[in-house]
A protein has these predicted regions:
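N-terminal small-domain helix-loop-helix segment of the aminotransferase-like
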Residues: 2-94, 99
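Conserved core of the PLP fold type I
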Residues: 59-170
Length: 170
């Protein structure tokens, strides 16, 4: 954090959070941003217009209410989830990763993931005060199954991320 922060605010923010660095967004002019799952092409004009009409007809000034249950059930059916299982929906992967870390924030808990990988795995662990254990991919950016298994046995993490292929290696 910046040294210009008001002293009263500095006392309220954990030291480990103050020492964190901002998420760096690399210059990408002229590049296809595969690491951010962005489509380099705009939607066709007719589709943009149709989506605009549909979005304009929605009651965006209200919470979804029971409509979220209908959406969740439809998505679970489409994914073929077994009875008794559910989906967790959120505003993007950062929010879902943070919520999982928050839910598992108990003394001694940790998070484990392959490296390099999605930066939010380690960042969410740090923000929640959880230990993060990274396991290096092989030199060919393949999952090192033996190293992952050994790390899981050694650390017994509350969360093990296996997003593979992952961001930014695939």
């Amino acid at each position: 954090m910046n040294d210009d922060i008001e002293p009263g605010l500095r006392r309220r923010i954990r030291q480990d959070v103050q020492s964190m660095h901002a998420y760096a967004i690399q210059e990408s002019t002229g590049m296809v941003k595969l690491d951010a799952m962005e489509n380099p092409h705009r939607l066709p004009a007719d589709l943009q217009e149709a989506l605009g009409r549909r979005l304009g007809a929605l009651a965006l000034n209200r919470y979804p209410g029971s409509r979220i249950d209908t959406l969740r059930a439809a998505l679970a059916g489409h994914a073929g989830l077994p009875e008794g299982f559910s989906l967790m929906l959120g505003n993007g992967s950062d929010e879902l990763i943070s919520l999982l870390a928050m839910a598992c924030d108990v003394p001694g808990a940790s998070i484990l993931a392959p490296l390099p990988g999605f930066v939010m795995y380690a960042m969410s662990a740090q923000l929640q005060g959880l230990a993060f254990h990274g396991v290096d991919l092989t030199p060919d950016f393949e999952l090192d199954e033996a190293a992952m298994s050994a790390a899981i046995r050694a650390h017994r993490p509350a969360i093990t991320y296996l997003a593979y292929p992952n961001n930014p290696t695939a």
